Amino acid sequence: MAQQQRMQGQPMIIMGDDAQRVKDRDAQEHNISAARAVADAVRSTLGPKGMDKMLVSSMGDVTVTNDGVTILQEMDIDNPTAEMIVEVAETQEDEAGDGTTTAVAIAGELLKNAEDLLERDIHPTAIIKGYNLAAEQAREEVDNVAVDVDPDDKDLIRSVAETSMTGKGAELDKELLSSIIYDAVNQVAVETNDGGIVVDAANINIETQTGHGVNESQLLRGAAISKDPVHDQMPAAVEDADVLLLNEAIEVEEAEADTSVNIESPDQLQSFLDQEEKQLKEKVQQIADTGANVVFCQKGIDDMAQHYLAKEGILAVRRTKKSDIEFLTNVLDASVVTDLDAASEADVVAGSVTRDSDDELFYVEGESEQAHGVTLLLRGSTDHVVDELERGVSDALDVSAQTLSDGRVLPGGGATEVEVASRLRDFADSVSGREQLAVEAFADSLELVPRVLAENAGLDSIDTLVDLRSAHENDDDEHIGLNVLSGDLEDTFEAGVVEPAHAKEQAVTSASEAANLVLKIDDIISAGDLSTDKGDDDGGAGGMGGGMGGGMGGMM
């Protein structure tokens, strides 16, 4: 039905017949239901005992993972509110490297508790104000609970990496992997003028190999490039390498405009072939004149050019991935040549290029003092194994680097959430008005984390939360959390279950901002069909306008 307004006694049509509109409380219920559906899709993956999801793309590609951001990015979501929650995970991944599932789950719980407040006639503005106050106080309390990290404390930083990998594909070999990760971040860490530490993630690369055990993974100085020489007669390795990085095809230049040539005799054809060969020989000579004996080319290399490069004794690799070329610039302290005509000896850098014929990898090391870069060579039995291993190690790398830079860690196992929630309830007593109820709701939302950890471990979530609250009444027990492996409550900091403080602060920030953004919406205007059926109490997918695109990307 067309939306109408009356002006001077006459109806005015301002929306088309196909347009639909949902306002006020219906709009809030619609959005909250959509957001909760996304949060509930990943909450069962939280923690060491979390379950995996199988994602099947429209092309039939299968991904098995419990990585929150991977699941949400692969889901075929067709709802603007749900996409806001996906952005929470993406922001968390970009800013902190881990904690995506925690951030999304808390956002969903904040909206669930906000819905209860709305039913009690608490205005959205009061809820938003209360959530903002609570988020600010929560970040302050996280900092108060945090423990400072000595950059030389290898065991503690390894514990951060191991906590991140627990429950993921990297868990079984987490001791080996955490040691590799610690060495990697330390090798590229740089001390700043003010005494701080910065770890540039661009100086760490991950390469994967199938057909081996995870326990054969290793840390390499420099880069590992999964490529072959373009010609059999080329050297397989060059110890004293002079390397040129090239982003220009070593091929015959094509005419800028479409042209046609009539060839009337074999001599004419030979003339064209000779001209092409001359162009290729000139390009190869340009490379040789720079003094380079190794070329990593991002684009193609003509067969004839390969022949002449081999005659010059130059090792050449074609179609090197852009990401590998960029990493090689760090490893070699080199720049990329984009125009061979302008190439010179200054573009060539010294290094070492060796070859592992079994793994079909080039190992590249730089010699400059400004050269940086290490490679984690991860091995696994199958593609699925190494893909999940890479995701787990990537997250662990990020949180280890964050810990080294930020210098603060927190007890895991829900200890931080319960302690901060307890302090927020004390803070709520100082908040006047209905905002106090929102602060208390925020505290309740944080406690979702220990509840879900217990739930996913097959424990009673209510009993676990009650026991944790009781333990945290003692000022000396702020590190008491749930050991999901044993089912006992213990000092998780002493047990080595630790998390980076920055990731927890970012999770609080991302979750609260997303919840407030959803709560501010009181009107939805759609040009097409807009379903407004609410989901069930568990945040079912009903109520998501257009649904979730046929489910979670084919997830079964």
Curated annotation (Swiss-Prot):
PANTHER family: CHAPERONIN (PTHR11353)
Pfam families (UniProt xref): Cpn60_TCP1
Similarity comment: Belongs to the TCP-1 chaperonin family.
GO biological process, one term: protein folding
Purpose of the protein: Molecular chaperone; binds unfolded polypeptides in vitro, and has a weak ATPase activity.
Keyword Nucleotide-binding included in the entry's annotation: yes
Span list, region Disordered: 530-556
Signal peptide positions (record): none
SUPFAM superfamilies: GroEL apical domain-like, GroEL equatorial domain-like, GroEL-intermediate domain like
UniProt GO MF annotations: ATP binding; ATP hydrolysis activity; ATP-dependent protein folding chaperone; unfolded protein binding
Gene3D superfamilies (UniProt xref): GroEL, GroEL-like equatorial domain, TCP-1-like chaperonin intermediate domain
Protein name from the UniProt record: Thermosome subunit beta
Species annotation: Halobacterium salinarum (strain ATCC 700922 / JCM 11081 / NRC-1)
CDD domains from the UniProt entry: cpn60
Entry keywords, A to Z: ATP-binding, Chaperone, Nucleotide-binding
Gly residues: bias regions: 540-556
Quaternary state and interactors: Forms an oligomeric complex of eight-membered rings.
